[in-house]
Amino acid sequence: YNTNKQAVHVSSGLMGGHWTVDARLTRLSSDGYIRRGGTSLTSYMFQGGYYNGNTMLKLVSFGGKAKTNLSYNGATRDEMRLNGRRYNSSGMYSTSDAYSHRIWNSEDGEWQQVNFYDDETDNYLQINNQLILSQRLSDRWTLSATAFYTYGYGYYKQYKDDAKLFEYLFPDHLAYQTDDQGNFVTDGDGERIAVRRDLIREKLMRNH
């Protein structure tokens, strides 16, 4: 499934009787077994240390970035039998163009002409930094202290078919249908008629 892993690791050993430096960089990528189920992962580690008698001071930084296609919707037995065992419904939308696919939709119980958005992904970056101090006070006692900071940022990207624009906080004059005079169009119950569009959304998160 075109899976590849590369890693580089360097280590200085003890330099000048006091200093050490270690670093590692890793990359993993795969197309995955499930269609549009690929992944791309990178990670790093850096560590610098100072040693002097009973004192140790160490700076550690590690983290990584992940981009993973969404492929955890699952599939029914009929969908796998008729669409193949690698079937993935993620990113599917209805279409009638010449490049569409004919698939079995078990939820509706019928064949449909659909296409797939290939970049429906989960994306996340995290960085961890640590400063570690260790002081040996005696044969029985050691004092240790650690300061740390973690930062994370991520989002998932999805194709939404026939989405209502007001659900995404579009202003009313864009989210609801209007006539030539700019008045809102209403249905038989007097409710404004929502504008629907195909769109790509990104839902974000950050953590500290």
Named regions from a protein language model:
Residues 3-5, 28, 41-43, 124-128, ...:
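Transmembrane beta-barrel architecture of outer-membrane proteins
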Residues 37, 146-148, 158-161:
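Composition- and surface-driven signal marking solvent-exposed, interaction-prone regions
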Residues 2-29, 34-73, 129-136:
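Transmembrane beta-barrel wall of Gram-negative outer-membrane proteins
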Residues 1-11, 183, 203-208:
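Outer-membrane beta-barrel transmembrane domain signature of Gram-negative proteins
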Residues 56-132, 157-207:
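Acidic/polar loop-and-plug regions of large Gram-negative outer-membrane beta-barrel proteins
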